[in-house]
Amino acid sequence: MSAPPALQIREANAHLAAVHRRAAELEARLDAAERTVHAQAERLALHDQQLRAALDELGRAKDREIATLQEQLMTSEATVHSLQATVHQRDELIRQLQPRAELLQDICRRRPPLAGLLDALAEAERLGPLPASDPGHPPPGGPGPPLDNSTGEEADRDHLQPAVFGTTV
């Protein structure tokens, strides 16, 4: 076998050198990629740890908030029960006072005529008694002689009470 020509040897050497350079370059890139992956893995692990801590804190905060809300709910329910009892008591009081309110409304409806009657009685008191006169001659506009079917008691009462109205207002 004959020796390969020098050109082939140089080409083969150049090719081997290029392969070695390429291998070294790839190894350098692989090392860089491994460092990058390792750094990313560390960052991800740290980030995962931070997220787990935040998630744990959120869980504790949620539990605290649930406890607070349960306490508020119990307080609100107690308040509702208290208010319902108060409403029931007031409803009972209203039921008891309703007849009295109706009576007062009836009194208020009757007040104006009663006030008119009291004014008329006061006017009668102001006028005073009739002057004494002869029973045979009644004053004009006054009561007339006793009727035929009268018992005469009315005349006796008029004789005993000379005032028109014997009341004071």
UniProtKB/Swiss-Prot annotation:
Location relative to the cell: Cytoplasm
Region feature Disordered, mapped onto this chain = 126-169
* Superkingdom, natural source: Eukaryota
Q: Where is the composition biased (Pro residues)?
A: 136-146
Q: Which residues form a coiled coil?
A: 7-89
Alphabetical GO CC annotations of the entry are: cytoplasm; type III intermediate filament
Point to the regions of Low complexity compositional bias.
Answer: 126-135
What name is this protein filed under? Answer: Vimentin-type intermediate filament-associated coiled-coil protein
